[in-house]
Amino acid sequence: QKKLEKVLKTFKVDTIYHAAASKHVPLVESNICEGARNNILGTLYVVKAAINEKVKNLVFISSDKAVRPTNIMGASKRFAELCLQVYKEKNPLTNFSIVRFGNVLASSGSVIPKFKQQIMEGGPVTLTHNDVARYFMTVPEAAQLVIQAGALGKNSEVFVLDMGKIIKIRDMIIKMINLAGQKLKDENNLDGDIEI
C-alpha cells in the first residue's frame, strides 16, 4: 500500500482504474487464499491508498459473477465491491464506481482463442456442458463502460452494460466451426470434421 501511495503522490493521479484481479474461476477455486488476497486485499490496498492520497475517482472492475455468487471468484469480487461501498460512506472526497463485466471477446483468458485453436488443430473443442450460456461484450464496449463509469460514478454506483441476449456456447462453437470451413461431427453427422 505504501508503494502505491508513493506512485499516486509522485504522479498526482486523478483517476484509478483498478482492474488487477484473479479472474479465472478454476484457478481461484484451486488457489482460494491467493484469489482472496488478490481480489479482496488488493482492492482494499488500492481503496486505502486512493483515500490517503485524495484521488478524485476510483473505478473498480468487478464481474457479473459478483451477482449472487456461486463460486469463490464471484464471492471475492462481491466482497471487494462491498469494501468500496463501506469506505465511500466514510470518505466522500473520492468517487467510487463499480463496473461489472461479463465475458469480453478477445480479452486475455477469453475462450474464443482457445476454441479457435482447437478448431484449427482439428478438434475436439472442449465444452464443459452443452447448456452453458454466457453474455459477451466487445473490447470497445467494455472500454466505453469503464470510461463512462469514471465520468458518471458517485456513491459507489454499480454500472452494468446491457449485453443483449445470452449466447449458448455450443451454438457459438458450431458457428466458429462453420466459419472455419468445417462441419460439426456429431451423432447427426458422422462425416463431419470437428467434434465438440
List PLM regions with ranges:
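Conserved Rossmann-fold cofactor-binding substructure of NAD(P)-dependent oxidoreductases
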Residues: Q1-T15
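CheY-like receiver
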Residues: V7-F11, A49, L145
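Conserved Rossmann-fold NAD(P)-dependent oxidoreductase catalytic core, especially the SDR/UDP-sugar
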Residues: K12, H18, S22-E81, V86, ...
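Active-site-adjacent segment of SDR/Rossmann-fold oxidoreductases
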Residues: V86-T94, I119-M120, G153
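Conserved SDR Rossmann-fold cofactor-binding beta-strand/turn motif
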Residues: R100-G102, S107
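A conserved pocket-lining segment of Rossmann-fold NAD(P)-dependent short-chain dehydrogenase/reductase
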Residues: K114-M137, E141-I169
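Mid/C-terminal beta-alpha module of Rossmann-like enzyme folds, strongest
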Residues: L152-I196
